[in-house]
């Protein structure tokens, strides 16, 4: 399946597993909002540490606003290849997006992911 037009940068394959691991750990020891609506609210409230968006969302309009909103609010965001992988990391079947509010024991991983994403976005000029 082709990536949605909302995918602003290529997330390196070696960064996908740390992103999913951060979600798993934050789900167990911190606070994570699941779903596009909950992620949107967290971004608007300025409480999200990291927003993760699936690349294979159909129709893409469901999540197309998230990268724009994250950029406006200064929130970190990343993409993962599939909504199945994203859902599995959160302990559910599928989800299009998630927002880490409190990273709990995953703080170190989340900080590394945010730093890596900032470098990637800096290189692509977005």
From Swiss-Prot:
- What keywords sit in the KW lines? Cytoplasm, Ribonucleoprotein, Ribosomal protein, RNA-binding, rRNA-binding, tRNA processing
Q: Name one GO cellular component term.
A: ribosome
Q: Which cell locations does it reside in?
A: Cytoplasm
In the record, biological process GO terms are:
translation; tRNA 5'-leader removal
Q: Name one GO molecular function term.
A: rRNA binding
Quick check: keyword Nucleotidyltransferase in the entry? no
Its family?
Answer: Belongs to the eukaryotic ribosomal protein eL8 family.
Entries under NCBIfam families matching the protein = eL8_ribo
Subunit-structure text: Part of the 50S ribosomal subunit. Probably part of the RNase P complex.
Record-linked PANTHER family = RIBOSOMAL PROTEIN L7AE FAMILY MEMBER (PTHR23105)
Functional summary from the UniProt entry: Multifunctional RNA-binding protein that recognizes the K-turn motif in ribosomal RNA, the RNA component of RNase P, box H/ACA, box C/D and box C'/D' sRNAs.
Instruction: Specify the protein name.
Output: Large ribosomal subunit protein eL8
- Gene assigned in the entry: rpl7ae
């Amino acid at each position: 399946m082709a990536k949605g037009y909302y995918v602003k940068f290529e997330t390196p394959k070696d960064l996908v597993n740390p992103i999913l691991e951060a979600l798993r750990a934050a789900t167990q020891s911190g606070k994570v909002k699941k779903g596009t609506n909950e992620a949107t609210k967290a971004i608007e409230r300025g409480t999200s540490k990291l927003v993760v968006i699936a690349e294979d969302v159909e129709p893409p309009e469901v999540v197309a606003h998230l990268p724009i909103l994250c950029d406006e609010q200064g929130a970190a965001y990343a993409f993962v290849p599939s909504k199945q992988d994203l859902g599995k990391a959160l302990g559910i079947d599928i989800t299009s997006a998630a927002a880490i509010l409190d990273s709990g024991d995953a703080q170190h991983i989340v900080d590394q992911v945010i730093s890596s994403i900032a470098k990637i976005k800096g290189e692509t000029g977005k």
